[in-house]
């Protein structure tokens, strides 16, 4: 059995340490309260309880169990001494809040960090520097920047304040990069003017530089659309045609028009291969300031093309993107593997959904790629348009979708918009805190939603007043806006232009505890829907009161699913079907242990 030390390092559980600690506490006054046999019984019981959890336990959890068992033996004076000892040690630790965790990072024995993000290798110097900065930022955030009740609620797993290691800086979460504006109208990267590219391959190269710059100025993911690169296929076609005609003139050859077209298209195809490969390899080999490759999603949507010619060019880019992803990349051992990034999203639409449709071959290729590489992800144009006022657009980075928004001319706008940040509510804790009483459930729910609202407003207010100079690539040079130097970004924080999200976790366990059944059971589904509607109404109310784009965020937690489970077990013990796992179910998802086929799950 393993334990997690306070600095995040993992070590083997040692029962002798409990015996020694309790014995020392008992020997610190005249006359012992417990015999050696009683102390050993306490240690063995604590070991038994820890083993039943089926996971690594923290030092704090072990000390809580020890304290409870001392009390259970009736040794109240000893328990008081033990509590005082813990308090004194906590004061020492508070006076030196980050040293141990940073040292454990440098020595590569911080187990929390190893499990936190599979995209980061904590043994690498550049990654360590990011984690070290994160520790300092998190420490500042918890001690000086956030209200104490929000910090405590986060520590206790009542809520999760996302990305607190970036909160000290004025940074936002994720976005849709307005690549079209930057390529068509030019941009500035590191003080260097970048004008409109004169070929497809150059456009791809510039796109990767933009991606790296954007990733270094935010903590969340970003998305680009291949449709914004498609116009440069024609630019390259015209350029190649001019070059071929010049070559023909030089050697005195006059090819028939069809032969000329074949030569041009052949060279163009090579350039598309080169450009797509540039994006594929640059994205996974670039290192950003947050110690990892850019978290990028690439959107593949034929109907974003402005005309039929551009749609055909876009189809060529999509085809090559899928082919290269199907092939994969070689790792250091020379084995073909699936790269983590960029993520791919393929849109199913009328032109590619049915056999016989002009671009069905792309859907077949996408399905083939999915069967081997588990990408791309899919969006139904038809369903998304039903839900998003007739629009189809990508999620921001991983999974956060914007709400429709119109500019002053009444035109919908999606690219150039962003998410301010996320706070997640632990629905399981709401249910358990109510004791199963439905009236109390809604009362506790209101209290927790108010806590989330205040935490989200901390996120919003941290961005408020930020100058465009903080991230010129984002705010001045087109990725998100074209603001002037020294101009505040405040206007972009209101009116629904950007979103700020309430995440939720554990709907399954919440419903299971309150009703005794899964939320997929027809008799319990209504309660699950009531919970969802309640959160949605809260967001609508906050939006109305503040003119800020509050929204609901599904699937918000990753490693926090384990943190929440650990906190629930500590607060409420092991409850079969609710807290008996080392994780809780993410958002509205069906529990992994539940027997259900894929199609029923999708329908649900």
Q: Model segments located where?
A:
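Charged, amphipathic alpha-helical regulatory modules used
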Residues: 1-109
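Buried hydrophobic packing segments
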Residues: 18, 22, 229, 233, ...
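Amphipathic, well-packed alpha-helical segments that form the structural scaffold of globular domains
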Residues: 23, 453, 457, 508-512
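Short, hydrophobic beta-strand segments
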Residues: 44-51, 296-304, 509-512, 516
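Conserved catalytic cores of very large enzyme subunits
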Residues: 88-92, 98-496, 517, 521-604
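Contiguous, well-ordered alpha-helical segments that form the cores/surfaces of helical PPI scaffolds
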Residues: 500-513, 533
């Amino acid at each position: 059995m393993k334990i997690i030390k306070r600095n995040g390092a993992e070590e083997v559980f040692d029962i002798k340490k409990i015996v020694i600690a309790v014995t020392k506490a008992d020997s610190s006054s005249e006359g012992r309260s417990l015999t050696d046999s009683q102390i050993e019984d306490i240690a063995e019981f604590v070991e038994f309880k820890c083993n039943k959890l089926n996971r690594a336990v923290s030092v704090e959890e072990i000390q809580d169990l020890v304290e409870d068992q001392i009390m259970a033996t009736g040794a109240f004076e000893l328990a008081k001494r033990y509590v005082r000892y813990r308090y004194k040690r906590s004061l020492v630790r508070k006076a030196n809040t980050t040293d141990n965790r940073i040292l454990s990072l440098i020595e590569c024995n911080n187990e929390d960090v190893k499990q936190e993000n599979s995209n980061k290798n904590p043994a690498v110097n550049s990654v360590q520097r990011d984690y070290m900065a994160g520790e300092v930022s998190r420490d500042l955030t918890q001690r000086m920047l956030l209200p104490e009740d929000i910090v405590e609620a986060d520590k206790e797993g009542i809520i999760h304040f996302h990305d607190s290691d970036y909160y000290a800086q004025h940074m936002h979460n994720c976005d849709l990069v307005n690549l079209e504006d930057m390529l068509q109208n030019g941009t500035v990267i590191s003080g260097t003017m970048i004008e409109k590219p004169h070929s497809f391959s150059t456009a791809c190269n510039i796109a990767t530089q933009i991606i790296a710059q954007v990733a270094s100025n935010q903590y969340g993911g970003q998305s680009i659309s291949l449709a914004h690169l498609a116009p440069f296929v024609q630019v390259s076609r015209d350029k190649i045609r001019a070059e071929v005609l010049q070559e023909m003139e030089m050697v005195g050859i006059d090819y028939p028009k069809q032969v000329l077209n074949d030569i041009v298209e052949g060279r163009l195809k090579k350039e598309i291969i080169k450009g797509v490969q540039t994006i594929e390899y640059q994205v996974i080999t670039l290192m950003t300031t947050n110690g990892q490759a850019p978290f990028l999603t690439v959107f593949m949507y034929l109907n974003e093309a402005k005309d039929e010619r551009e749609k055909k060019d876009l189809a060529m880019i999509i085809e090559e993107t899928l082919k290269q992803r199907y092939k994969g990349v070689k790792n250091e051992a020379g084995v073909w593997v699936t790269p983590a990034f960029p993520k791919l999203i393929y849109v199913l639409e009328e032109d590619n959904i049915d056999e016989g449709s002009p671009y069905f071959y792309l859907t077949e290729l996408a399905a083939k790629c999915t069967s081997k590489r588990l990408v791309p992800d899919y969006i139904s144009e038809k369903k998304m348009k039903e839900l998003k006022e007739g629009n189809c657009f990508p999620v921001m980075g991983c999974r956060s979708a914007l709400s429709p928004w119109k500019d002053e001319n009444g035109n919908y706008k999606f690219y150039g918009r962003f998410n301010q940040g996320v706070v997640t509510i632990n629905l399981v804790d709401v249910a358990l805190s109510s004791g199963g009483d439905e009236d109390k459930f809604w009362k506790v729910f209101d209290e927790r939603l108010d806590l989330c609202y205040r935490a989200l407003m901390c996120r919003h207010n941290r961005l408020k007043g930020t100058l465009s100079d903080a991230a010129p690539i984002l705010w001045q040079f087109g990725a998100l806006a074209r603001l002037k130097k020294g101009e505040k970004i405040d206007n972009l924080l209101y009116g629904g232009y950007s979103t700020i999200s309430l995440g939720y976790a554990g709907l399954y366990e919440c419903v299971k505890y309150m009703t005794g059944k899964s939320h997929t059971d027809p008799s319990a589904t209504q309660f699950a829907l009531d919970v969802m509607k309640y959160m949605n109404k809260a967001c609508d109310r906050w939006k109305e009161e503040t003119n800020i784009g509050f929204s609901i965020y599904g699937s918000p937690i990753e490693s926090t699913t384990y943190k929440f489970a650990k906190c629930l077990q500590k607060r409420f013990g092991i409850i079969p079907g609710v807290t008996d796992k080392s994780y809780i179910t993410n958002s509205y998802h069906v529990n992994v242990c539940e027997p259900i086929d894929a199609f029923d799950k999708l329908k649900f």
